[in-house]
Amino acid sequence: MIEKIWSGESPLWRLLLPLSWLYGLVSGAIRLCYKLKLKRAWRAPVPVVVVGNLTAGGNGKTPVVVWLVEQLQQRGICVGVVSRGYGGKAESYPLLLSADTTTAQAGDEPVLIYQRTDAPVAVSPVRSDAIKAILAQHPDVQIIVTDDGLQHYRLARDVEIVVIDGVRRFGNGWWLPAGPMRERAGRLKSVDAVIVNGGVPRSGEIPMHLLPGQAVNLRTGTRCDVAQLEHVVAMAGIGHPPRFFATLKMCGVQPEKCVPLADHQSLNHADVSALVSAGQTLVMTEKDAVKCRAFAEENWWYLPVDAQLSGDEPAKLLAQLTSLASGN
């Protein structure tokens, strides 16, 4: 229902307009206060790159964070990552991730980023505290990438990158809750880069698509072509589950059942195992896999995806970030 409201297919969005105007007024006032320096943002001693979005829901932001971190690491840059840690609840904050940190403590996306990149990752509702925790333990960190936080104006940033779903884009264009917008589309004029996940990019936007890798068995780590798996049940607890199901079909998989779950939904063995019958194979997203690995069955697999950016702009962006991190 919410997708139909936000896309404008359902007329119910008009009933929510008063709340949207209030949301827009408050969020706009907050940003204006920082812009006019009525409130002061905290500036880190190292450059900060924000990877965020203008809309609620999944846009492919986390794969972009992983891509950025890996690309900078390949250039010899030491990168730290901070996040709000949505979906997790730590005993205390800030929380610096380790090999033993669970998604229940840190949230699924920070754990995924940590496992993928081996970069220092910290979570906290106050991102400045997360940055301080990283720099205290890892003084060699040269640049911070923040996963989400475009609207977290308490944190000063040097570069802003926005990720857009190229198919859904901005829906009906209205602020939450009548539409999907955290900020209106005009905000794009002030950011440093706009990355478009799928769809047809517009002038000045960087095209991106998610490239699936081999399926990985959660229990054994065995890899295989996902099309070799039979009697597949697909599960996705991400911001936009249909994207994952479409990726599977693109890979030649015709799932017998597709199970969309809420983003950041808590998972347990009983609930997940109930999704498959004898002889069926469960295929999930990598984000779900970090929550299920501890209690996985032998017939559970996940399909990792990597961000692939096209054109000349990604190289220019990386050169800019490398120069920033190097102090040039």
From Swiss-Prot:
GO terms for molecular function: ATP binding; tetraacyldisaccharide 4'-kinase activity. It catalyses: a lipid A disaccharide + ATP = a lipid IVA + ADP + H(+). ATP binds at residues 55-62. It comes from the Bacteria. It is an enzyme of class 2 (transferase). GO terms for cellular component: plasma membrane. It holds the Pfam family LpxK. SUPFAM superfamilies: P-loop containing nucleoside triphosphate hydrolases (SSF52540). InterPro entries: LpxK, P-loop_NTPase. Its EC number is 2.7.1.130. Pathway: Glycolipid biosynthesis; lipid IV(A) biosynthesis; lipid IV(A) from (3R)-3-hydroxytetradecanoyl-[acyl-carrier-protein] and UDP-N-acetyl-alpha-D-glucosamine: step 6/6. GO terms for biological process: lipid A biosynthetic process; lipopolysaccharide core region biosynthetic process. Keywords: ATP-binding, Kinase, Lipid A biosynthesis, Lipid biosynthesis, Lipid metabolism, Nucleotide-binding, Transferase. Belongs to the LpxK family. Transfers the gamma-phosphate of ATP to the 4'-position of a tetraacyldisaccharide 1-phosphate intermediate (termed DS-1-P) to form tetraacyldisaccharide 1,4'-bis-phosphate (lipid IVA). This is Tetraacyldisaccharide 4'-kinase. It comes from Escherichia coli (strain SMS-3-5 / SECEC).
